[in-house]
């Protein structure tokens, strides 16, 4: 029973983190769709805050052994790749 509870908590933690990552990904996609300047202070502030918050959530979940360090790195890495693609798309638009 205890093993089931741990597994349930791990699955729930991963699902919550993925949902938060998806929200950030949607912000990035909206910017890519409109190729709004990524240097906009408001855009940068919101995205930086969201990314920082998610990184803290991931760190907390890793420290509690709810997700693996690799899962956390993969999740954050995917978002960072999307951010790079946004910056590249905007730069190419100029």
From Swiss-Prot:
It comes from the Bacteria. Pfam families: DUF1507 (PF07408). NCBIfam families: PRK13666.1. Belongs to the UPF0358 family. This is UPF0358 protein Bcer98_2651. It comes from Bacillus cytotoxicus (strain DSM 22905 / CIP 110041 / 391-98 / NVH 391-98).
